[in-house]
């Protein structure tokens, strides 16, 4: 259960930076409510440890909200309410373009240089339906101040208003280098959206908005549609900035331990004093329609894609007038419907075994709505699904929900508050605050929403939930069914249409126009080259090598063996909660039992037990534990990378409040020892759903496939594990989903025999993080439970069936028109042990060669080099090309040798990497990481301190050594590409293996 985050306190005394006279003057001004043109309007308490202060600039109307606390991870964000009135993506395009330089900082590359070469913990920008926001954070107030100056100048005085090339680079441009070539389009935003539109779930969301709210601001895609992005004009970008980027249409959010007067004076003097209050027209001509509608959107996939049970059917309806208390009621309804025991889930399991269902309310929008969504179904299932839905809604509107479904929120909210206070995330805080402001007009609305959520256990009742259901679900004025249907072969058809578009565009051009476009491309390339020579980093880099703290805390874990059981115990002093895990080594099983056990641990918590019905079990779970997990997990052993060494465990664990400890152990025992495998339909249904969700989940996030395969590509000994836990396992699940009862019965027998081997105290590692008092209770509970386990002798097996190692070049086909390319190699093949200084040199390769070449010149959204003890690899993200990218990769060593690697350059990259270590972790996180290192036999005391020292040791003399490593990667690395079928098949000679399992 997730909730609004609260803020943690790091106690420290506030540093004074003004002289005494100015300080007294400013303090008095604040007491009386005014300072540097700002008036202190409100003070409010927020969460456990933050006071929120709202300031308004009297001349310009700008507002500043300060999250006043002692957190030293300080943050800034400025938000503007923005709207889209078409699908060109102007809000998104300007977000990119304004960070491509200002007249004070006339460098199109500076922002990206700052991201990687200053002492920051976060820098980015983002566009949503209602607003655009620009957040950054740093452990240094000085660095934060310098970084936000770049943001503010880029926002209010962007160079894109006078330099069109920034727009061409960041949005889109047409490429033609000779009269014989075909025209193409590229650009960061354009290629980013090509990648996003490859994800069926994202496309379903975007086009369902168009369906429910046609031609409203909410219907338009603020990020842009690739075909429409091509129509952007320079003048439209200028007009967009003039309309929306005004102080009176903004809120600045500040967070943490800062000198507020310094910031207020800066905002007033450098910006807001130059502006008057202005209103912004947010008129939306949309007129809500009434009645019921249906529509189908055809999602393009390649011809070999299996489209059976791959559609999304959404029943959507508006909820005008919804209140905060109604939203809480909907949260309870959502929780209730998501339970496997709910009437919805049980009926779907019977009628549509592969279907995945969820209910959601989108309320932070101009036009709030609810959706009942069914995944993994077919278009022709619509009528039957709507009949089930109608019956389910009638039940919600006639039967009161058990009050225990409300009571569970008290447990979850308390636990979430504790965890979020331990691990504050200022960027999340500020972005959410901006979103809530943009949905109304109150910059402190986020506090009201937070307080409303915390009231849920008292404000929501069975009666109020029934009333909310009746008010909004029974007869909505505006409703409909939207279907997203994948169509095999449509991707190829769309690709041909794209080729025709560019061919027709060229055919329509005169010879003079063609030559002009060629010259424009030459001029653009020259501009890119000239721009790379501009280096303004010294103007904004504040923290240098000598200022970086060389200190890091460490923790100790008790690692002992008693009664044949291994214990990994971490004392979490003063903790209000406990985390505990029973881990069973899967190497105790013969390989033929691996997949049955993997399925079994996925089934746990979703089947009734010998003592409890499924509904009773779910209520037991939500009223006792905060979170629970029954799964199988594998971890690579660093000292055994070349032999495929793996820790592979079946895990039963939970996190709970101290006062819920006894109930949580009782729950774990009930699930682990008493689950019954009698519901064959449920087993079939789960197997099918898991297979679908795993394939679709990875194919919808191709970068995750690339990352996993980059490790396997570097260490081919893990090929067998990849097949066993991915491709072969999914095929096994597919078979289970259609097994007759007799075969399911045989499968259950295998699972029961495997349990007798696996759940064995000689095969157990017990992990626990708790305070001292709770730890003794945990150990007592563990002994009581494990006394019921088998104590037979355990024999270790080779768990993964042998597979031929992956070849040196692999491609994976997923839907879409975007590619993710990688070249990878192990450190063993490089003949080196990992040293943290290599991370700094990899950043030089990334930011001085790969990123500017592949993003600025060729339009890939991102490119990077990365090195760790696992591997050394280069990769591209949302890339429009395949072969050209590998040409760039293979020129890395030659290009790296040309880079002037100075102490000054290294210091910039060092400071960014260093911030990851200097930020610190909560005690819980440190203990979790230390337990993990014990599990994989990679224990090292003061690891962070050692890496800090290695980072600081980097010098220009290391360039030659690292250049040799790059050369080995070029010559011996494994290549991996994930993406659409057309370029993979067009370059099929590059690949020894093409995997299509992700589009089954």
Give the label of every model feature segment.
Residues 71-83, 91, 109-157, 163-175, ...:
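M16 family metallopeptidases and their MPP-like homologs
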Residues 1-12:
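N-terminal secretory signal peptides that target proteins for export/translocation
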Residues 180, 186, 235-270, 726, ...:
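Non-catalytic, conformational "gating/processing" segments within enzyme and secreted inhibitor domains
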Residues 29-33, 37:
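Boundary at the C-terminal end of the N-terminal hydrophobic targeting segment
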Residues 19-28:
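Bacterial N-terminal signal peptides
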Residues 175-247, 253-256, 260-271, 275-302, ...:
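Hydrophobic, small-residue-rich alpha-helical packing segments that form membrane-like cores
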Residues 68-70, 77, 190-198, 202, ...:
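His/Glu-based metal-binding/catalytic segments typifying zinc-dependent metallopeptidases
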Residues 461-492:
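Extended, domain-scale alpha-helical bundle/helix-rich regions
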């Amino acid at each position: 259960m997730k909730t609004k985050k609260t803020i943690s306190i790091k106690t420290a005394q506030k540093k004074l930076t003004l002289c005494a006279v100015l300080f007294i003057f400013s303090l008095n001004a604040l007491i009386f409510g005014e300072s540097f043109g700002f008036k202190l309007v409100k003070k409010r308490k927020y969460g456990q440890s933050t006071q929120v202060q709202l300031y308004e600039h009297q001349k310009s109307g700008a507002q500043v909200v300060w999250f006043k606390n002692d957190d030293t991870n300080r943050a800034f964000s400025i938000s503007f309410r923005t709207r889209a009135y078409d699908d060109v993506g102007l809000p998104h395009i300007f977000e990119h373009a304004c960070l491509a330089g200002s007249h004070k900082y006339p460098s199109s590359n500076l922002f990206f240089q700052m991201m990687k070469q200053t002492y920051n913990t976060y820098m980015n920008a983002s566009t949503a339906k209602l607003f655009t926001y620009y957040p950054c954070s740093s452990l240094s107030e000085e660095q934060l101040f310098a970084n936000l100056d770049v943001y503010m100048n880029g926002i209010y005085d962007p160079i894109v208003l006078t330099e069109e090339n920034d727009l061409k680079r960041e949005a889109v441009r047409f490429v033609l280098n000779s009269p014989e070539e075909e025209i193409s389009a590229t650009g960061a935003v354009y290629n980013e959206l090509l990648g996003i539109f490859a994800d069926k779930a994202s496309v379903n969301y975007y086009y369902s908005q168009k369906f429910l709210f046609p031609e409203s601001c909410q219907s338009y895609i603020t990020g842009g549609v690739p075909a429409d992005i091509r129509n952007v004009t320079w003048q439209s970008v200028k007009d967009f900035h003039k309309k929306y980027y005004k102080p009176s249409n903004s809120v600045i959010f500040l967070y943490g331990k800062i000198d507020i007067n310094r910031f207020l004076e800066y905002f007033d003097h450098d910006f807001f004093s130059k502006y008057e209050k202005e209103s912004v027209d947010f008129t939306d001509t949309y007129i809500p329609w009434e009645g019921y509608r249906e529509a189908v959107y055809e999602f393009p996939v390649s011809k070999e894609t299996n489209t059976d049970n791959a559609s999304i059917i959404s029943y959507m309806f508006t909820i005008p007038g919804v209140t905060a208390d109604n939203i809480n009621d909907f949260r309870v309804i959502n929780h209730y419907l998501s339970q496997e025991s709910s009437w919805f889930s049980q009926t779907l399991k019977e009628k549509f075994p592969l279907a995945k269902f969820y209910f959601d309310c989108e309320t932070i929008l101009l036009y709030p709505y609810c959706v009942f969504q069914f995944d993994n179904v077919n278009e022709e299932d619509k009528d039957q699904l709507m009949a089930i839905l109608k019956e389910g809604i009638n039940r919600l509107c006639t039967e009161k929900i058990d009050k225990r479904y409300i009571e569970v929120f008290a447990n979850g909210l308390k636990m979430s508050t504790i965890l979020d206070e331990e691990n504050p995330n200022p960027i999340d805080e500020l972005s959410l605050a901006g979103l809530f402001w943009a949905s109304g007009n109150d910059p402190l609305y986020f506090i009201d929403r937070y307080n409303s959520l915390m009231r849920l256990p008292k404000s929501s009742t069975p009666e109020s939930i029934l009333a909310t259901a009746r008010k909004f679900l029974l007869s909505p004025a505006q409703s409909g069914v939207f279907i997203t249907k994948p169509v095999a072969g449509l991707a190829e058809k769309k690709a041909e249409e794209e080729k025709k578009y560019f061919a027709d565009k060229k055919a329509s051009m005169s010879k003079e126009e063609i030559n002009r476009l060629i010259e424009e491309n030459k001029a653009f390339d020259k501009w890119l080259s000239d721009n790379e020579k501009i280096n303004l980093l010294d103007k904004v880099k504040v923290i240098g090598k000598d200022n970086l703290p060389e200190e890091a805390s460490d923790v100790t874990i008790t690692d002992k063996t008693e009664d044949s059981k291994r214990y990994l115990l971490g004392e979490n002093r003063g903790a209000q909660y406990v985390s505990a895990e029973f881990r069973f080594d899967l190497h105790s099983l013969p390989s033929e039992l691996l997949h049955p056990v993997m399925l079994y641990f996925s089934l746990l918590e979703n089947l009734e037990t010998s003592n409890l019905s499924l509904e009773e079990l779910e209520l037991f779970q939500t009223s006792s534990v905060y979170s629970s997990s029954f799964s199988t997990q594998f971890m690579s052993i660093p000292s055994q990378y070349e032999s495929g060494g793996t820790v592979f465990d079946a895990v039963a664990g939970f996190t709970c409040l101290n006062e819920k400890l006894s109930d949580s152990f009782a729950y774990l025992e009930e699930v682990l020892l008493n689950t019954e495998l009698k519901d064959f339909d449920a087993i079939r249904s789960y197997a099918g759903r898991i297979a679908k969700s795993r394939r679709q989940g990875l194919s919808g996030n191709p970068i995750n496939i690339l990352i996993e395969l980059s490790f396997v590509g570097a260490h081919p000994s893990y090929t067998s594990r990849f097949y066993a836990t991915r491709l072969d396992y999914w095929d096994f699940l597919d078979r289970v989903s259609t097994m007759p009862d007799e075969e399911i019965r045989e499968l259950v027998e295998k699972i029961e025999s495997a349990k007798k081997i696996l759940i064995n105290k000689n095969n157990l590692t017990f992990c626990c993080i708790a305070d001292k008092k709770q730890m003794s209770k945990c150990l007592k509970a563990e002994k009581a439970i494990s006394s019921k386990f088998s104590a037979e002798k355990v024999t270790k097996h080779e768990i993964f069936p042998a597979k031929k190692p992956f070849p040196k070049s692999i491609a994976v086909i997923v839907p879409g028109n975007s590619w993710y390319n990688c070249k990878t190699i192990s450190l063993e093949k490089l003949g080196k042990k990992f040293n943290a200084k290599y991370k700094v040199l990899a950043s030089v390769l990334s930011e001085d060669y790969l990123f500017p070449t592949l993003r600025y010149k060729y339009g890939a959204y991102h490119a990077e080099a990365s090195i760790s003890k696992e591997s050394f690899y280069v990769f591209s993200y949302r890339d429009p090309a395949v072969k050209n990218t590998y040409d760039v990769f293979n020129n890395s060593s030659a290009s790296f040798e040309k880079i002037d690697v100075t102490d000054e350059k290294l210091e910039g990259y060092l400071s960014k990497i260093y911030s990851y270590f200097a930020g610190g972790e909560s005690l819980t996180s440190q203990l979790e990481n230390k337990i993990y290192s014990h599990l994989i036999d990679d224990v090292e005391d003061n690891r962070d301190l050692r890496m800090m020292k290695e980072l600081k040791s980097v010098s220009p003399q290391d360039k030659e050594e690292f250049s040799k490593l790059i050369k080995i990667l070029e010559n011996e690395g494994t290549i991996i590409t994930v993406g659409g079928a057309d370029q993979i098949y067009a370059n099929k000679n590059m690949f020894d293996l093409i995997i299509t399992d992700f589009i089954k």
